[in-house]
């Protein structure tokens, strides 16, 4: 069971980062993986208003936001074409569409669960993952 004492919708990445410096505070995304823990959260940090839910295609590659859902990854035509369907295949068998509509790339990478098919596709030699601690 998860208990949340306070909720804050971050207005900037800097604010979210500052809030997340306290050990008891947690970042919220799709909340799929947080439900697997028995935790007390001081402040729940909502990133939904920061525009991190987009996939941008550039000449160099793709910029994938932390709040992009697994379903967005699965259905993105540019990623499918660029990876010859590998991204789509890495997520399409994960539970069901309902879960993929909620689970986020950021949560899937940050949690580092051994069962994460998403983690594997981001380990490809030509991918770069930028994490800010």
Segments (PLM) and residue ranges:
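C-terminal structural segment of proteins
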Residues: 1-132
């Amino acid at each position: 069971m998860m208990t949340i004492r306070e909720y804050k919708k971050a207005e900037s990445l800097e604010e979210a980062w500052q809030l997340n410096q306290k050990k008891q505070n947690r970042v919220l995304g799709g909340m799929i993986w947080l439900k697997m823990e028995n935790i007390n959260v001081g402040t729940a940090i909502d990133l939904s208003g920061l525009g991190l839910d987009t996939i941008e295609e550039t000449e160099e590659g793709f910029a994938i936001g932390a709040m992009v859902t697994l379903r967005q990854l699965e259905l993105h035509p540019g990623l499918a074409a660029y990876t010859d369907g590998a991204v789509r295949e890495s997520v399409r068998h994960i539970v069901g569409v309902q879960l993929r509509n909620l689970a986020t790339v950021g949560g899937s990478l940050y949690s580092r669960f051994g069962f994460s098919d998403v983690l594997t596709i981001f380990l490809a030699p030509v991918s770069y993952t930028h994490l800010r601690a």
